[in-house]
Amino acid sequence: MSWPSLSGVPNGSSSVSTWLSVTHPRRSLPKELLTAFDTCNVAPEALLVLRSTSLMILEETCVVVGAAEMPTAEDNSGRELFIGSNGDPMERKTRTAHHAIKKTVRIKKGHRTTFAMTVANGAYVKFGARPLTEANVLVVRKWIVKLIADEYKDLRVCDQALVIDRATFLSFIPTMAWNNYKFIFHGKNAVTDRVAGENLFSRIAQWANPGKXGCPVVVTGQGCVISRAPDCAQLRVKRLLGVTKNRTCMRVSGVSPNIQIIPFNNDITTLERAIKERVFFVKNLDKGSPTKFVSPPRPAPGVFAQRLSNTLGLLVPFLPSTAPMSHQQFVDSTPSRKRKVYQQALEDISCHGLNLETDSKVKVFVKYEKTDHTSKADPVPRVISPRDPKYNLALGRYLRPMEERIFKALGKLFGHRTVMKGMDTDVTARVIQEKWNMFNKPVAIGLDASRFDQHVSLEALEFEHSVYLKCVRRMVDKRKLGNILRHQLLNKCYGNTPDGAVSYTIEGTRMSGDMNTSLGNCVLMCMMIHAYGLHKSVNIQLANNGDDCVVFLEQSDLATFSEGLFEWFLEMGFNMAIEEPSYELEHIEFCQCRPVFDGVKYTMCRNPRTAIAKDSVYLKHVDQFVTYSSWLNAVGTGGLALAGGLPIFDAFYTCYKRNSNSHWFSGRKGRLKTLSSVDDSLPWFMRELGLKGKRSSAEPLPASRASFYLAWGVTPCEQLELEKYYKSFKLDTSTLLEEHLWQPRGVFPDED
C-alpha cells in the first residue's frame, strides 16, 4: 500500500478556518452543485449551521435511498440492458448465469453535502478539533474510507468518491461550541490567570518534592505471593534462614508512560512459584472446575510421527549436510560478551574431559528482567534454566553449522522466507509486506502458544532431535550428537537462593538456556503449522520467530483454518489460541512490533507505550554517573539505528543522546564501544540488531504519522505534542533520587 500525498494544503495552518477562504455568503450556498473543491471554500459559519442541523435533515428527507434491483430491458437484437440512474438504457458488458443483478444505494439528488456532513460529524467525534495538516488529513481520510466501506458498502462508487472527499475536509471545521470555549479558555484574561496558578502550583510541587525531573530513580525488586498451585511430588523445596538481597535497577523519571516496571527478586518463594506455574502446572481452562491448576497437556504416543510425516518428507530435500566445528572455532564464533565463559569451558574440557551426566544438569534461577506489573496485576516470574557451559560447547559445535541453513530450509518449505531471526526492522517489515501481498484479500492472524517451553513434550523433543540428526553427514558424528541430545530428555534441575534451595527432575520440556532453544522452537512451530495447513488444505504463509507466529491467508479461508485449530494443537500437547484477525497491514503484530510506513518503505515499530517504559529502565544500580551517561548514549544510539525517523521514537532516543554528555561516543568505533560497554543491560533487539540497523535521526514524514496512528492509535497531534515534550526535556545526570521520593507520572495523552 502506498500513502497518497496531499497537495494544496499550506504547512503550519493552525486551523481549517485560517486556510479556507470565505467566498460564498450563506444565503447563496449552492449545496446541490458543491464539489470537493467548492466545499473547501464554503464560509465556516454556514458549515457550522449545516453541521448542527445535518442529522435532522437526514431524518426528514431520507437522504439514503433503499436498495433496489436495477430494472432491465431487452432491445430488438436480444441484448440485455439495464436502466441507468439517468433513465437511459445501458448495455451490460458481461453477463453470465451465476452473476446476480447488483443492488445499489444512492444519495438523493441535492443531499450529497448533507450526507457528507453526517460522515464528517462522525470523524469530528472520533478525532476532535485538530489542525489541517497532511498527516491529519491522511488519518481522517483513511478512517472515512473504512467507515464507508463497512457501513455503506452498497453506495454507488461515484457517491462514495464525492462523500469521502467532502467529508474529509468538512471534518476539520470546528464547531461553534469549540470556538466559544476556545475563546473562554484561551482569551487574554484566562491565560494570565492560568499561568499565575500554574506558577504557584509549580513552586508548591518543587517544595514538596525536591527531586529533579529526568534524574535516575532507584527501583527495588520485589518478591511475589506464594503460589496457589498444589505441591508437586517431584519438586523438593528447602527453606533456610538466609536474608535475600534485593535486586535494584534504575529508571529515568519523567520520560515514560505510567507503567510499573519492577524486577523480581531471586528468593525461594519467587523461585518456587516460577517453577510450579511455568514448569509443572498450567491454569485449568475449564472455568467451572474446582481445580485451578492442572498438568500441561501431553500428546498421544506417535502423534508427531503421524501428523508431521508429510511435512518432514517435504523438508528433508532442503536440509543441509554438515560436519561439526572444532571446539576453538565455536568459541571464536561466540559473541564477545560470552566468549570468556566458553574459553574457560574449553580449557576445563581439555584438562578434565566432558562428563555428560554432571555437565548436563540444569541450574535454575529467577530471571532478572523488566516485568510489567501494570498490564498484569499478578505476573508470574520467569525462570532461567542453563546447563553447564561445557555441555553447551559440546552441543553447540554440532548445531551452529546447521542453524542458519535449517532456517533457510524452513523458508523453502513455505516457498518464502519464514524465520525472521537476525533480520533488522526494515527487512522484517519488507518480508511481512511481501507475504501480505501474496494474497488477493489477505488476512493475518497471530497464533499465541501459551508458555511454549513448558509444553514441549518428550515426543516433541525426540522429533526435533531427529531433524538435527538428518543434517549430520558422518555416522560417527550422528552417534555423538544423539548421545549429547539424549540428556535433554530427562532434566535434573537444582537452584539455590540465600533463603532456600530447590531440586526436581522432569521429563521433557524446554530448558531456556539450551543451545537449541531458539532453533528447536522454530523447527517445531514451523513444521506443526505447515502440517496443519496441509490438514486443512489451506494455502498459508508464515512469519516465525520461535514461539511468535503470524499466519497469512485469504479471508475466504479464515473460517476453515480457524475451525478446530485449538483442538488439533491440544492433541499435539500445545495450548494454541488464535488472536484477533488483522485486515490492515499496520495491525499485524509480530514480536511486539507492527509495520509502519516511514514515507519510503515499511519498517517494524514497537509499541510506543511499553517500549518507552522499558527503555527507561536500566537493570543495574547506578554507582557512577559515567555509566549512566554511557547507558543513555547506548540506548539512544541503538534506538535511532532501529527507529530513526519514526514518530515519537526519534525524539525520545535523540533526547537520550542529547542528554548523555558523552561526546566521545561518535562514529562506528564509538558506537561499538558504547553498546559493548553496557551490553548486558541493553534490550535483546538492541544487542542483536542495534549494530545492523541503518536508520538515523530524521523528521517524521506526514505519511509516517498517519501510518503510526493506524498501527498504535496515537494521533498526529498527540505525536507532535510528545515530540515537543522530548525535544525540550532535560535529563539530570547528577542526582540520584530514592524511590519513595518519586511518583510515576504518565507522559502519554490518554494517561492521568
Curated annotation (Swiss-Prot):
Q: Name one GO biological process term.
A: viral RNA genome replication
Is the keyword Transport assigned to this protein? Answer: no
Record-linked PROSITE patterns:
RDRP_SSRNA_POS
Q: What are the GO MF terms of this UniProt record?
A: nucleotide binding; RNA binding; RNA-directed RNA polymerase activity
SS bond partners: none
Q: Does the keyword Metal-binding apply?
A: no
RdRp catalytic domain location is 442-561
Q: State the InterPro entries in the record.
A: DNA/RNA_pol_sf, Rev_trsase/Diguanyl_cyclase, RNA-dir_pol_PSvirus, RNA_pol_HCV
Which reaction is the catalytic activity of this chain?
RNA(n) + a ribonucleoside 5'-triphosphate = RNA(n+1) + diphosphate
| EC main group | transferase
Annotated keywords: Nucleotide-binding, Nucleotidyltransferase, RNA suppression of termination, RNA-directed RNA polymerase, Transferase, Viral RNA replication
EC number in record: 2.7.7.48
Miscellaneous note, as given in the UniProt record, is:
Readthrough of the terminator UAG occurs at position 213.
Q: What does this protein do?
A: RNA-dependent RNA polymerase that plays an essential role in the virus replication.
Q: What's this protein's family per the entry?
A: Belongs to the tombusviridae RNA polymerase family.
Q: Tell me what this protein is called.
A: RNA-directed RNA polymerase
